[in-house]
Amino acid sequence: MAAVTSVSFSAITQSAERKSSVSSSRSIDTFRFRSNFSFDSVNVRSSNSTSRFVVHCTSSSAADLPTVADTKLKFLTAYKRPIPTVYNTVLQELIVQQHLTRYKKSYQYDPVFALGFVTVYDQLMEGYPSEEDRNAIFKAYIEALKEDPEQYRADAQKLEEWARTQNANTLVDFSSKEGEIENIFKDIAQRAGTKDGFCYSRLFAVGLFRLLELANVTDPTILEKLCAALNVNKKSVDRDLDVYRNLLSKLVQAKELLKEYVEREKKKRGERETQKANETVTKCLGDYQYAGR
């Protein structure tokens, strides 16, 4: 993914939409996709069930740390309404990944990670029927991880606003400048360089990519320079951005199938109602004719 910085998230999604030509006669319940993100089994049944398996965070020895099942249960308890599975499946897999990162000894919250999650979440939930529900799900999700949803949103917005004022050179040259955002990057670089209090994750990689996109960076070498300045492994970032791009493509296909399914159900329901109305009219006319004899 050498030229990853020249491709925007919106361009990825639009490209996937052009490529997704899925037959409407295909059963939506059998549609599945797999990626290295472990997001799979997408269909349109509403589901709020939680997995029975329990995954313990082996990177910490604290006996009182919550399990994955605890975190998922907390999320489902906070948001009780059914979520269409095309969204819920990815959310459930994502919360597993984020739980395991969240409870590592080396984990420390940072705004780039928050920007990455907000970006992924907003891409995933784009087109969700209710904005109110979308916000409620976000709140329940972050609070299930014992973090602050308002901080996630505020920090993501702050980074986005800053990135829009940057260019390729100023984005990389943060170490020679003073400022709130520059100090955040310096702190990340220091922690990543000493391996003390820094936990790299795929969401962090997405956060970096989002910064480059907002700064209108088209030079593919800038990502490499930014990774070097932050003491982050460029190969890991490239790999994880490839996975995310694949996820976006699969989500477009799944949502298209969901849309087709809903439209077919509406059509069937309309046909049934029309048939029922015709039968009622016919019966009434028959009764009227019989009564008039």
Swiss-Prot record:
Organelle targeting sequence: 1-45
Example of a GO biological process term: thylakoid membrane organization
Coiled-coil annotated spans: 240-273
Segments crossing the lipid bilayer: 198-220
Compartmental location: Plastid, Chloroplast outer membrane; Plastid, Chloroplast stroma
InterPro entries xrefs: Thf1
Any one Pfam family match given in the protein's UniProt record, by short name: ThylakoidFormat
Chloroplast intermembrane side: 46-197
Segments in the Cytoplasmic topological domain: 221-293
Membrane topology: Single-pass membrane protein
Source taxon at top rank: Eukaryota
PANTHER family assigned: PROTEIN THYLAKOID FORMATION 1, CHLOROPLASTIC
HAMAP family, sorted: Thf1
Function field: Involved in a dynamic process of vesicle-mediated thylakoid membrane biogenesis. Required for the normal organization of vesicles into mature thylakoid stacks and ultimately for leaf development.
Family membership: Belongs to the THF1 family.
Protein name, entry field: Protein THYLAKOID FORMATION1, chloroplastic
Annotated source species: Solanum tuberosum (Potato)
